[in-house]
Amino acid sequence: MDGILPLYKERGMTSNDAVIKCRKIFKTRKIGHSGTLDPEVDGVLPICVGKATKVVNYLMDSGKVYKGEITLGFATTTEDLEGEVISKVKLSEPFSDEKINEILSSFIGDIIQVPPIYSAIKVNGKKLYEYARAGEKVDIPERRVHIEYFKQIFPSKFDKEKGQQTIYFEVGCGKGTYVRTLAVDVGKKLGVPAVMSDLTRLKSGGFQIGMAKSLSQLEKLAHENKLSESLYPIDYAVKDLPRYDLKLEQWRIVKNGGFLSVNTFKEDYDRVNLFYDDRIRCIYQYNKEKNRYQSERMIDLS
């Protein structure tokens, strides 16, 4: 069984937990996810099954959409509600939604982030959270990420008794963006400590949350021998690339890892999906130096 499963990952489990459960349901070890969701975050997690594992990197490179909450008034070690409170202030009055929207909009475009110390990013072969738990200091490398949009989806709420304000947001962002860090940086621009207090992934790899299946739904489909109904075709991961259907003689060349001339296609492509017998077989890319097309990823040679 080959294809892509948009899984609805519930809160309380790691992304690897989800993979392990899917392996049991699909009865195969050839399964992998396309981008970690923290345990306390729910939402769509694309899972690649069988030959679809060969396109997992394309899914990881795609944009993502989240909705969530930012709470102004305190900050934690983990930048979410899982960590210890490290700073706290009581807001005497709320920020206007006009001001909040102005701040959110200032993040649109390419920005520089310093990822949270409690993250799985590796520095010198060691994960950052391992440094944090050991109490060791480490220089966290900056990274450039892209924010497509960042907006409020509901009016903010002010808790006068606690002196805290909650912002309800939606963000479209590129690969590698830490939404926790976005929340903290919003607070910095407003001059107060902040934390990401809730998060749901709405979209990943082109899959909307409404397309996702829960583990209980998968178990039901497995019991009914209908698991294949949960899978999208492998080419869904690269659906934005142009498609070219190979002739038999071309397929024989491609199957053996051969090159294709620039005259093969009517248009100039940087990358192209190659199909044979109505199945995606591989992705070819243009080699400018050699003026030819060559394999970028072989997917299905059967």
Swiss-Prot record:
Example of a GO biological process term: mRNA pseudouridine synthesis
Statement: the UniProt record of this protein carries the keyword Kinase: no
Catalytic activity: uridine(55) in tRNA = pseudouridine(55) in tRNA
GO MF entry, a single one: RNA binding
Keyword Ion transport: no
Enzyme class, first EC level, given as a word: isomerase
A Pfam cross-reference name: TruB_N
Coiled coil feature spans: none
EC nos: 5.4.99.25
Gene3D superfamilies: Pseudouridine synthase
Active site (record annotation): 38
CDD domains noted in UniProt: PseudoU_synth_EcTruB
Record's signal peptide: none
Swiss-Prot/TrEMBL keywords: Isomerase, tRNA processing
Family: Belongs to the pseudouridine synthase TruB family. Type 1 subfamily.
HAMAP family: TruB_bact
Protein name: tRNA pseudouridine synthase B
Organism name: Ligilactobacillus salivarius (strain UCC118) (Lactobacillus salivarius)
